[in-house]
Design a protein with these regions (language model features):
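Generic low-polarity alpha-helical segments
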Residues: 1, 24-28, 72
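N-terminal secretory signal peptides that target proteins for export/translocation
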Residues: 1-11
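Serine residues within intrinsically disordered or low-complexity segments
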Residues: 10-13, 29
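Bacterial N-terminal signal peptides
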Residues: 15-26
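Extracytoplasmic
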Residues: 30-245
Length: 245
């Protein structure tokens, strides 16, 4: 489970398609977090770092880029909570055609898609930053959804992170460390732009939230939980963690 808490849901799209996104909730887990001593959560946690035929990196590294779509293995109630069991990106918006990106984790409830550079979908003139092409992201988020990411922290200390995201109407997220709230509510600024004539593209205006979170992290393996708190309608690609100054 997450390490327990709350959140919203995002909308992603494709020509004439407005979708929603999934990723974080307040929910208790099969984990024991009573004293939150270092290692206690990780020892009891039933999820495992993501891996597949292409990604064999194990726990995601901090400092470094932490990919949201590489949330942990373990399923609903352990590695994530989503408002429904259907992946509205992989296998639905992105048809199941046998390709890696279109079918990425399509049997899981977290809604996932990837950036597309045709028809000015994700390489559009309304971006505040240009995202990488074929960048996987968690989308269709709704309040109450969450997902866990196991990370390997090189050295104990304070870290800040930038977030690559889109948000049709703003909202808030939060981040837990080993089952305890570590961030409080974090404001996501809306990327809505009324001058874009294409309605569905409001879910594809990319931006970076600089230093959106500051965490004190112990060295070694830790579990981060991303919660969607309010609004949803966000696409969350990755957090870039660096040592705080």
């Amino acid at each position: 489970m997450p390490l327990a808490r709350r959140v919203p849901r995002s909308i992603l799209s494709w020509p004439a398609l407005v979708v929603t996104f999934a990723a974080a909730v307040t929910c208790a887990s099969a984990i024991n977090y009573q004293d939150n001593q270092k290692g206690a959560l990780y020892q009891d946690y039933k999820g495992t770092p993501y891996q597949d035929s292409r990604y064999q990196g194990g726990a995601q590294k901090i400092p470094g880029r932490v990919e949201c779509a590489y949330y942990d293995l373990g399923g609903e109630g352990v590695a994530y909570h989503d408002s429904d069991a259907k992946n509205h990106g992989s296998g639905e918006l992105n048809h199941a055609d046998g390709t890696y990106l279109n079918q990425f984790r399509m049997d899981e409830g977290v809604d996932i898609s990837y950036t597309k550079f045709h028809d000015q979908i994700d390489n559009n003139p309304f971006n505040l930053v240009q995202p990488p092409e074929n960048q996987l992201y968690v989308g269709w988020t709704e309040p109450g959804e969450w997902f866990n990411i196991t990370v390997q922290v090189a050295r104990a200390g304070f870290y800040t992170a930038d977030l690559l995201y889109t948000s049709n109407r703003g909202g808030t997220i939060s981040m837990d460390l080993n089952g305890k709230d570590a961030s409080g509510p974090l404001t996501i600024v809306s990327t809505f732009n009324a001058t874009d004539p294409i309605a569905w593209r409001q879910w594809h205006h990319w931006n970076v939230a600089r230093n959106i979170v500051r965490l004190r992290l112990p060295a070694g393996k830790n579990v981060l939980t991303v919660h969607i708190l309010t609004e949803g309608n966000m696409n969350l690609a990755y957090f870039d963690f660096k040592k705080a100054r």
